[in-house]
């Protein structure tokens, strides 16, 4: 499966709803070892004043489903939290060190 056009669609949908600072692709697609059962893992870093993450995820997922893009895991975090956690938390550090930046503001 060609992942690049799907990633572009995901990025467009996210940016429609979220003023992202960074959007990372992580997991098997970023690391080059996806399987047929792999989902697309996306990590979004937002400004600190970004609204309700649950509502934003619901809007993003709704738009993705209209584009027939279903297998996406979304994680959102605020920029100040990411700056602290990227050196301490295992997931955040892995995303920062090994993830692929697909958008940067």
Q: Each PLM stretch: what is its role?
A:
Residues 1-22, 31-36, 46-105:
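Catalytic core of pol beta-like nucleotidyltransferases
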Residues 26-28:
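Glycine-rich beta-strand-to-loop/alpha-helix junction loops that act as flexible
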Residues 41-45:
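Short beta-strand->loop micro-motif that forms the acidic, two-metal-ion catalytic signature
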